[in-house]
């Protein structure tokens, strides 16, 4: 289950890994029945990048299947509660739910936010305590244009530049993908900063670099919109390049 063997190669001289975990915080745009009335007439908002990360769940599943890794995927719309924000963050709730009574917002946190976060935090804590080093890949996607401005990248890796393990792993994965697809526009810490509030940022506070490497993988949604061969090819290349970065052989 996500356990790799020590091996020679560039990737493992940069980062040794033991346990791979795949998560997806914005995998769907589902609305629980109890809150359906709040979202009446908001289909366009739910379908937009504000409602979910299109393609992130599909990519997350393919990565988890390829490595036999534990997966923690959420399909409730982020407009109900954003699983990639900390409690108290101003964007934890959207304009749809922010004005709800405190008790109802707490109910949302208890039923939809905490189960996802606690499952991930618990799994990583158990393996860290047992001496494993966890590689956590959070699958995300971003809209091709934001406020009318095109985003000039295809794939990006978000990480904390103060953590050597994350720097090395993101670079190894990026270089492995670049070798397979030099035509792709690849960047690091774009279109967001890896140190910003989020699940990986929370986990970094609890685990040292030697025990935890947290990477948010961001893919441009224009591939998802194309569907077909371009999207399938990108997913396959991301899995293959991740395998190389991890230093894992295909016959393990």
Predicted regions and their residues:
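N-terminal catalytic or cofactor-binding beta/alpha core of small enzyme domains
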Residues: 2-252
């Amino acid at each position: 289950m996500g356990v790799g063997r020590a091996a020679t190669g560039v990737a493992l001289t940069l980062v040794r890994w033991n346990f791979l975990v795949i998560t997806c915080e914005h995998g769907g745009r589902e609305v629980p029945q109890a809150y359906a009335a709040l979202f009446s007439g908001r289909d366009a908002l739910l379908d937009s990048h504000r409602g979910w990360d299109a393609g992130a769940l599909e990519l997350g599943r393919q990565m988890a299947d390829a490595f036999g890794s534990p997966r923690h995927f959420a399909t409730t719309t982020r407009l109900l509660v954003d699983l990639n924000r900390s409690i108290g963050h101003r964007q934890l709730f959207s304009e749809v739910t922010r004005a709800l009574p405190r008790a109802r917002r707490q109910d949302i946190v208890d039923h939809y936010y905490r189960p996802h976060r606690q499952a991930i935090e618990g799994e990583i804590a158990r393996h860290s305590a047992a001496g494993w080093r966890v590689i956590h890949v959070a699958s995300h996607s971003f809209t091709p244009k934001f406020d009318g401005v095109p985003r000039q990248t295809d794939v990006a890796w978000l990480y904390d530049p103060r953590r050597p393990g994350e720097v090395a792993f993101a670079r190894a994965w990026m270089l492995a993908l670049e070798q397979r697809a030099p035509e792709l526009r690849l960047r690091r810490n774009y279109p967001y900063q890896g140190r910003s509030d989020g699940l990986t940022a929370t986990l970094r506070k609890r685990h040292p670099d030697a025990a935890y490497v947290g990477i948010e993988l961001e893919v441009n949604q224009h591939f998802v919109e194309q569907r077909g061969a371009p999207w399938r090819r990108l997913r396959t290349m991301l899995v293959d390049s991740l395998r190389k970065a991890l230093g894992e052989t295909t016959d393990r």
